[in-house]
């Protein structure tokens, strides 16, 4: 029996915004649940999301490849930590394996989704016009999707080449050029080693250093690749790695300054720093962070410290104050002549920064949040019915792809239950969202995430991005916090509520 015949009604239309890990994961879960009227939108011209756009030299993941992939589609990875091209190839293969390409509309920038109270569906807007109506909308836009380019004085006067690392200009030949990298995060620390053998001079401007730990990345041996061709073997490796990471983050202990786990992590990072730069006390001082371990996202790299010892690499431990026609002036007033200026300044850390969402009674989601992003399980917001946020508030942490799989299961089960109830919409109850947020914030209290200079905090100082524990605890909550925390209604928001007297169906129950 198909889901459609069981519902005894039309297959609901579902719009998914974004064709990266989040959007693809949600689409596959919904497709496997029996839904066919799924449309995926992406402003890019192909699948991959972040890994379609971020094609900078040296781009690779920080997470082990066996975890940075879907559990239901293992892959014969070439490395322990895969590079951008192979990861983008993987996501493209997933799209084709599940026949999603025909449902993808690439090169379409969705500006807004607007809830129609009477029809109980969303109007999908692109280019100022409605291009589709959908009963449900799943956002796979993510948190870090809109590049942040600082408005530096004199930037427009620069006569060289300038671009953001997430918008890499492959037409520019960096051979023999004087290259400046602004930033000191994960991308910047990948760029320095990658460019030092090409550019004449690489100058990195680091306003504040990060704790750095070794990645231990390497190519898999032929024997390892042969073993990992077995889905069972890869699942065992995946689960072992997942449990090890989960145990380290249990109860947020790793992120609590003064805890045994946090002290050990910081001591390990400090030892790695000092041993890598032994004999260079000035450099050691320049790259030693002043914040507790976890106060900013730790950087994972095997090659950065060694690159700093190269003759053509210069670290400037000051921010860029001004840009001139032929270079930059740092905060101390020193001028540095450069030919190419690469902004490795991250992204606008704002949920749904590229998407406007209008919910019940014409409310804007960004106005509703008012700079204080929050969501039930990171997925649903009161008064925004039939709308789901993948990788939403307080879901960053643990293992991202595993979290996304859990979220996709929640979305699929919630939609299935709504259709079985013949509900026109489902939304989280306000009291449930409030209680959930209070509990999460209490769990986050006292962690290094409260450090002032990071992207974890909202305008009010509340920690808006991080999940305080591991994947397992989050997974349990996505299975348990269903009914009665959700409200199913048969018509408009004023219609009688369908009482969910049974839990939402388990995955595979169709």
Language-model regions: role of each:
Residues 4-11, 21, 25-46, 139-271, ...:
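Rossmann-like dinucleotide-binding core of oxidoreductases
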Residues 79-144:
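Feature captures the FAD/FMN-dependent oxidoreductase FAD-binding
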Residues 17, 132-144, 180-182, 328, ...:
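Short hydrophobic core segments
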Residues 87-104, 297-322:
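Helical element adjacent to the flavin cofactor pocket in flavoenzyme catalytic cores
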Residues 211-214, 226, 374-375, 386-510:
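C-terminal, flexible cofactor-proximal segment of oxidoreductases
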Residues 6-104, 207, 275-279:
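Beta1-alpha1 glycine-rich phosphate/pyrophosphate-binding loop at the start
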Residues 75-93, 257-263, 292-303:
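Short beta-strand to alpha-helix junction loop
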Residues 106-120, 316-331:
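A conserved short coil-to-beta-strand element within the FAD-binding core of flavoproteins
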């Amino acid at each position: 029996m198909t889901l459609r015949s069981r519902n005894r009604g039309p297959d609901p239309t579902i719009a998914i915004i974004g064709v990266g890990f989040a959007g693809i994961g949600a689409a596959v879960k919904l497709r496997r649940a029996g839904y066919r009227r799924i449309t995926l939108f992406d402003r890019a011209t192909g699948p991959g999301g972040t890994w379609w756009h971020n094609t900078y030299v040296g781009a690779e993941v920080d997470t082990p490849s066996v975890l940075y992939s879907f559990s239901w589609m293992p892959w014969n990875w070439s490395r322990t930590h895969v590079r951008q091209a192979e990861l983008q190839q993987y996501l493209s293969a997933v799209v084709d394996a599940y026949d999603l390409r025909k449902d993808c509309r690439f090169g379409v920038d969705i500006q807004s989704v607007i809830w129609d109270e009477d029809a109980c569906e969303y109007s999908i807007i692109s280019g100022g016009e409605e291009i589709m109506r959908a009963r449900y909308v799943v956002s796979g836009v993510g948190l870090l999707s809109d590049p942040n380019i600082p408005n530096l004085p004199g930037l427009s006067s620069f006569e060289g080449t300038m671009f953001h690392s997430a918008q890499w200009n492959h037409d520019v030949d960096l051979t023999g050029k004087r290259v400046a990298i602004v930033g000191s995060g994960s991308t910047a620390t990948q760029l320095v080693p990658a460019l030092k053998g090409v550019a004449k001079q690489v100058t990195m401007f680091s306003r504040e250093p990060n704790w750095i730990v070794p990645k231990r990345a390497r190519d898999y041996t032929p024997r390892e690749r042969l073993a990992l061709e077995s889905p069972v073997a890869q699942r065992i490796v995946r689960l072992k790695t997942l449990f090890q990471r989960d145990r380290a983050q249990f109860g947020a202990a790793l992120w609590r300054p003064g805890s045994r786990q946090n002290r050990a992590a910081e001591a390990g990072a400090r030892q790695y720093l000092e041993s890598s730069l032994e004999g260079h006390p000035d450099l050691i001082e320049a790259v030693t962070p002043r914040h507790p371990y976890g106060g900013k996202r730790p950087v994972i790299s095997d090659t950065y410290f060694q690159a700093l010892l190269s003759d053509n690499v210069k670290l400037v431990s000051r921010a860029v104050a001004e840009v001139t026609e032929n270079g930059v002036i740092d905060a101390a007033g020193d001028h540095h002549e450069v030919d190419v200026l690469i902004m490795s300044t991250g992204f606008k850390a704002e949920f749904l920064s590229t998407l406007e969402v209008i919910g019940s009674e014409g409310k804007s989601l960004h106005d509703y949040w008012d700079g204080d992003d929050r969501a039930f399980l990171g997925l649903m917001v009161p008064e925004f019915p039939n709308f789901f946020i993948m990788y939403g508030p307080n879901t960053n942490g643990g293992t991202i792809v595993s979290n996304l799989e859990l979220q996709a299961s929640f979305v699929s089960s919630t939609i299935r239950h709504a259709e079985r109830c013949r509900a026109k919409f489902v939304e989280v109850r306000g009291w449930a969202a409030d209680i959930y947020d209070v509990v999460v914030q209490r769990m986050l209290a006292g962690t290094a995430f409260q450090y002032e200079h990071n992207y974890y905090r909202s305008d009010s100082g509340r920690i808006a991005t991080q999940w305080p524990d591991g994947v397992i605890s989050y997974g349990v909550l996505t299975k348990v916090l269903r009914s009665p925390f959700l409200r199913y209604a048969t018509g408009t928001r004023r219609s009688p509520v369908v009482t969910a007297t049974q839990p939402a169906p388990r995955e595979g129950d169709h």
